[in-house]
Amino acid sequence: MRKIRVVVIDDSAFNRRAIIKMLESMPEVVVAGYANDGEEGIRKVIDLKPDLVTLDLEMPKMDGFTLLRIIMGYCPTPVIVISAKSDDEKVFKALELGAVDFVAKPSQGISEELLTITDDIQQKVRGVFSLNMKEIIRREKVEVLAPPPVAPKKAEAEPRRVVPCRLDVVAIGSSTGGPPAIQRILSSFREALPLAIVISQHMPAGFTRTFAERLNRLSVFEVKEAADGDTVWPGRVLIAPGGHNMVFEKSSGSVVVRVRKPSPEDRYIPSVDAMLASCAEVFGPRTLGVVLTGMGNDGSRGVRAIKGAGGQALAEAESSAVVFGMPREAIATGVVDKVVPLDLIAREIRMRCGVATDLD
């Protein structure tokens, strides 16, 4: 089997050594080279043509954003950003520019703790050969040519349904490639749907609040990071908090969020399966589950639960998925109602809701 060739770009000598040590412990990986600033980094990427680049965003001579634009424009290569939690807004900018994923340093200023992210970075590196680089390049070009407009100011969401709808909730799960995909779906609507949307995106603690705030600015929905006790109501989008699972329960005639610590068997967090299964239990046949891009099989048990409760399930098509792992496993269950390219998912949701909501 061909080994995964990686170039490590980081201005911290300790961080470079730590990342190289992690990578060299993987028999399927070879570190082809490293660089301590952006200018040297782009030369190494062009000369060595690696399968993957790990990238620090804050560097001398050429910052990570400039380097990322050059890589995606001249020698498209999968890039994993390694970032401090304090740089959360920068991470989402990097994902928009074409980075495929990110790994969070455990805490700012404690380089030694970088060693604790070994499992996370190794898992993401192993998925490099399953990445859909054509779709990553296409999305990056679309964002550069036509960045999403700022959504019109929204009125405060009210806990009531103002238009009849065949669904109560749309539950979306995703992993690698998910943040730009979710942004694309939500920003496609010109008006909020008369249903709730709940989202579990595999993401560490410390990043989901910024993700929710970003989506809130770029869509007509009220989007927030879910907190325990939040009410689920039409027009509201709730994002599972990083490092925790989001489930639901009925309380005094409403449905509320319960934020739970992950169980030992939860490999992926926040768990898409846990969210989908809870939606099936609470919302029953008025649930639509959507499994987007991502590695692994999270979501496959959840779509079975939704179908068992009489609900509906969609999966993202291979043509648009950055990683087809999660959608493939959902489709393999045999219960998915339709396989849909990313750019048509918002329209499909609207049709299944049964409301004539305008789309861009």
From Swiss-Prot:
It comes from Geobacter metallireducens (strain ATCC 53774 / DSM 7210 / GS-15). GO terms for biological process: chemotaxis. It comes from the Bacteria. The gene is cheB2. Keywords: Chemotaxis, Cytoplasm, Hydrolase, Phosphoprotein. It catalyses: [protein]-L-glutamate 5-O-methyl ester + H2O = L-glutamyl-[protein] + methanol + H(+); L-glutaminyl-[protein] + H2O = L-glutamyl-[protein] + NH4(+). Contains a C-terminal catalytic domain, and an N-terminal region which modulates catalytic activity. Phosphorylated by CheA. Phosphorylation of the N-terminal regulatory domain activates the methylesterase activity. InterPro entries: CheB-like, CheB_C, CheY-like_superfamily, Sig_transdc_resp-reg_Me-estase, Sig_transdc_resp-reg_receiver. Residues 5-120 form the Response regulatory domain. Gene3D superfamilies: 3.40.50.2300, Methylesterase CheB, C-terminal domain. SUPFAM superfamilies: CheY-like (SSF52172), Methylesterase CheB, C-terminal domain (SSF52738). PROSITE patterns: CHEB, RESPONSE_REGULATORY. It is found in: Cytoplasm. This is Protein-glutamate methylesterase/protein-glutamine glutaminase 2. The modification 4-aspartylphosphate is found at residue 56. The lineage of its organism: Bacteria, Pseudomonadati, Thermodesulfobacteriota, Desulfuromonadia, Geobacterales. PANTHER family: PROTEIN-GLUTAMATE METHYLESTERASE/PROTEIN-GLUTAMINE GLUTAMINASE (PTHR42872), PROTEIN-GLUTAMATE METHYLESTERASE_PROTEIN-GLUTAMINE GLUTAMINASE (PTHR42872:SF6). Signal peptide: none annotated. GO terms for cellular component: cytoplasm. Residues 169-356 form the CheB-type methylesterase domain. Its main location: cytoplasm. NCBIfam families: PRK00742.1. The active site is at residues 175, 202, 298. Its EC number is 3.1.1.61, 3.5.1.44. One of its GO terms (molecular function) is protein-glutamine glutaminase activity.
